[in-house]
Amino acid sequence: MRLSEKQQIFTACIGKLILFASSKEYGLTQGDGYRDPRVFGEMGEKRSYTSKNSVHKIRLAHDFNLFVKGEFISDGGHPAWLELGEHWECLHKDARWGGRFDDANHFSFEHWGCK
C-alpha cells in the first residue's frame, strides 16, 4: 500500500475516533498532528524533542487533549483514555494507541515498524 493511501485511511479513522468520543460526550481538542521534517528532521533524524522515527513526520499520528464533563484529563490511566484507545485499535490492523507505551493521547498507524 502506498503511503498516501495509508494516510487517507488514517484520516478517515481519526474522523471515526472523533465521532466515537463525541458519542460518549468526551471532548477532544487538537494536540500534535503533522511534524514538519524541516523543523523536526526527516524520518530517522532527530532534530528536536520528537522521536527520530515519529510517524507524526509522515502524517500517520495525531495527539489529542481529552475533556470529560468539561475537565481536562491529563492522567493517561483515566478510563476514558482506555475506552478511546481500545476503540481506536479496533478500527484498523495498523492502528496503535499510545496508552500501550505511556503516551495515552497518541493515536497512530504503524508504518515501517514505527508507531
Regions found by a protein language model. Name each.
Residues 9, 13-55:
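Secreted/periplasmic proteins that engage bacterial cell-wall peptidoglycan
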Residues 50-115:
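Catalytic cores and adjacent binding grooves of peptidoglycan-active enzymes
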